[in-house]
């Protein structure tokens, strides 16, 4: 991937009535995190607990701490395990322990430096420490940059399902340094591309077409810096617009769950960590695409376009061998169930989806049969 140089940061507002904030892309990146915190109104001199994992802390931890110190903050670094199988209340308790040792106060700050798992756990720890302190997201994976870090969803997994324990807790700032993708493993990059494709299907047909026109998508080295910036901007803008209009998933925000209903089943039944989150979402998008064809909501050509783009990104498209009745049982425990009815985000065309709560169990069985 080309070196990312962008002196002028791109600033995308998340226009919430009670606590608006910015998604900042580029600029000085992690070198400027201290300045960006001050711009966001976080007081100089406060204690800051930076939470990261070893793979991220090694190349970027000192850089982040130095920037915070230079701007007058008092940072401490906590390094945790960050696999999906570590996304548990026990791991959050470790963050709470570090917050206690650092004597964090209500005016203090937690900073998530890492991917989606670090962001989810740190956000939840901040939401529950002293009944809620501020959090800043510094995403270092593509998936976190375009999705997980934006919007305030935090939480951990339960043996019965993904993200069943959590809270809405909006960050004070999201700072995206695209240069951190230079050290991201290719598999993680591909997983993030699933969420980018999702935005194309649910509301940005032009983004979908842009991705279709790129010869190869499955490694970061295949994207020029200006193209990567465009992908990050369009994805962050898509997420921020939805969150700004529906912060707590009362309506429109549910479209962001496209591919996630089936995807969470795959993660739960295959075991957390077997698939990366983005990989499971990719499988889920193919599955719900098949469901949409069976319901005659969209045509086979569009379903095939989606499937081809997902495959081009190096993502899995095959449904795993799972007992259909176990799938149905797990779906019933999904947090998106409403009034006992299964809710799915169903595509009606590239760039358009509908939220449906009338999907029958027999339709799901038929869909799973077609996928097998």
From Swiss-Prot:
<feature type="binding site">
    <location>
        <begin position="180"/>
        <end position="183"/>
    </location>
    <ligand>
        <name>NAD(+)</name>
    </ligand>
</feature>
<feature type="binding site">
    <location>
        <position position="277"/>
    </location>
    <ligand>
        <name>Zn(2+)</name>
    </ligand>
</feature>
<feature type="binding site">
    <location>
        <position position="260"/>
    </location>
    <ligand>
        <name>Zn(2+)</name>
    </ligand>
</feature>
<dbReference type="GO" id="GO:0046872">
    <property type="term" value="F:metal ion binding"/>
</dbReference>
<dbReference type="GO" id="GO:0009073">
    <property type="term" value="P:aromatic amino acid family biosynthetic process"/>
</dbReference>
<dbReference type="Pfam" id="PF01761">
    <property type="entry name" value="DHQ_synthase"/>
</dbReference>
<dbReference type="Pfam" id="PF24621">
    <property type="entry name" value="DHQS_C"/>
</dbReference>
<keyword id="KW-0862">Zinc</keyword>
<dbReference type="GO" id="GO:0005737">
    <property type="term" value="C:cytoplasm"/>
</dbReference>
<dbReference type="InterPro" id="IPR030960">
    <property type="entry name" value="DHQS/DOIS_N"/>
</dbReference>
<keyword id="KW-0456">Lyase</keyword>
<dbReference type="GO" id="GO:0003856">
    <property type="term" value="F:3-dehydroquinate synthase activity"/>
</dbReference>
<protein>
    <recommendedName>
        <fullName>3-dehydroquinate synthase</fullName>
        <ecNumber>4.2.3.4</ecNumber>
    </recommendedName>
</protein>
<dbReference type="InterPro" id="IPR050071">
    <property type="entry name" value="Dehydroquinate_synthase"/>
</dbReference>
<keyword id="KW-0170">Cobalt</keyword>
<keyword id="KW-0520">NAD</keyword>
<dbReference type="GO" id="GO:0008652">
    <property type="term" value="P:amino acid biosynthetic process"/>
</dbReference>
<keyword id="KW-0479">Metal-binding</keyword>
<keyword id="KW-0057">Aromatic amino acid biosynthesis</keyword>
<feature type="binding site">
    <location>
        <position position="162"/>
    </location>
    <ligand>
        <name>NAD(+)</name>
    </ligand>
</feature>
<feature type="binding site">
    <location>
        <begin position="116"/>
        <end position="120"/>
    </location>
    <ligand>
        <name>NAD(+)</name>
    </ligand>
</feature>
<keyword id="KW-0028">Amino-acid biosynthesis</keyword>
<comment type="function">
    <text>Catalyzes the conversion of 3-deoxy-D-arabino-heptulosonate 7-phosphate (DAHP) to dehydroquinate (DHQ).</text>
</comment>
<keyword id="KW-0963">Cytoplasm</keyword>
<feature type="binding site">
    <location>
        <position position="195"/>
    </location>
    <ligand>
        <name>Zn(2+)</name>
    </ligand>
</feature>
<feature type="binding site">
    <location>
        <position position="153"/>
    </location>
    <ligand>
        <name>NAD(+)</name>
    </ligand>
</feature>
<feature type="binding site">
    <location>
        <begin position="140"/>
        <end position="141"/>
    </location>
    <ligand>
        <name>NAD(+)</name>
    </ligand>
</feature>
<dbReference type="GO" id="GO:0000166">
    <property type="term" value="F:nucleotide binding"/>
</dbReference>
<keyword id="KW-0547">Nucleotide-binding</keyword>
<comment type="similarity">
    <text>Belongs to the sugar phosphate cyclases superfamily. Dehydroquinate synthase family.</text>
</comment>
<dbReference type="InterPro" id="IPR016037">
    <property type="entry name" value="DHQ_synth_AroB"/>
</dbReference>
<dbReference type="InterPro" id="IPR030963">
    <property type="entry name" value="DHQ_synth_fam"/>
</dbReference>
<comment type="pathway">
    <text>Metabolic intermediate biosynthesis; chorismate biosynthesis; chorismate from D-erythrose 4-phosphate and phosphoenolpyruvate: step 2/7.</text>
</comment>
<dbReference type="GO" id="GO:0009423">
    <property type="term" value="P:chorismate biosynthetic process"/>
</dbReference>
<dbReference type="InterPro" id="IPR056179">
    <property type="entry name" value="DHQS_C"/>
</dbReference>
């Amino acid at each position: 991937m080309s070196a990312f140089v962008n002196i002028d940061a791109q600033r995308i507002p998340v226009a919430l009535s009670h606590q608006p904030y910015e998604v900042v892309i580029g600029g000085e990146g992690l070198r400027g995190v201290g300045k960006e915190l001050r711009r966001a109104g976080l007081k100089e001199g406060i204690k800051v607990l930076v939470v990261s994992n070893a793979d991220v802390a090694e190349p970027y931890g000192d850089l982040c701490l130095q920037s915070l110190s230079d701007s007058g903050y008092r940072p401490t670094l906590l390094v945790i395990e960050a696999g999906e199988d570590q996304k548990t209340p026990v791991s959050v308790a470790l963050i709470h322990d570090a917050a206690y040792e650092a004597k964090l106060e209500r005016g203090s700050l937690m900073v998530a430096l890492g991917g989606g798992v670090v962001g989810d756990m740190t956000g939840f720890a901040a939401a529950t420490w002293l009944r809620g302190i501020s959090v800043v997201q510094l995403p270092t994976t593509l998936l976190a940059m375009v999705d997980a870090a934006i919007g305030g969803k935090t939480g951990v997994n339960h043996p019965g399902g993904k993200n069943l324990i959590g809270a809405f807790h909006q960050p004070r700032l999201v700072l995206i340094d695209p240069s951190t993708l230079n050290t991201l493993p290719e598999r993680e990059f591909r997983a993030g591309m699933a969420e980018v494709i999702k935005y194309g299907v649910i509301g940005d047909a032009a983004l979908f077409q842009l991705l279709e026109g790129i010869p190869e998508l499955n490694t970061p080295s295949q994207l020029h810096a200006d193209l990567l910036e465009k992908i990050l901007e369009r994805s962050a803008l898509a997420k921020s617009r939805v969150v700004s209009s529906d912060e707590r998933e009362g309506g429109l925000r549910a479209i962001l769950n496209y591919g996630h209903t089936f995807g969470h089943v795959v993660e739960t039944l295959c075991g957390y960590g077997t698939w990366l989150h983005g990989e499971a979402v990719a499988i889920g998008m193919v599955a719900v695409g098949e469901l949409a064809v069976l319901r005659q909501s969209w045509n086979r050509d569009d379903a095939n376009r989606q499937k081809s783009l997902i495959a081009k990104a190096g993502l899995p498209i095959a449904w795993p061998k799972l007992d259909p009745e176990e799938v149905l049982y797990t779906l019933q425990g999904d947090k998106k169930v409403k009034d006992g009815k299964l809710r799915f985000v169903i595509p009606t065309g590239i760039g358009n989806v509908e939220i449906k709560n009338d999907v029958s169990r027999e339709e799901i069985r038929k869909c799973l049969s077609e996928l097998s």
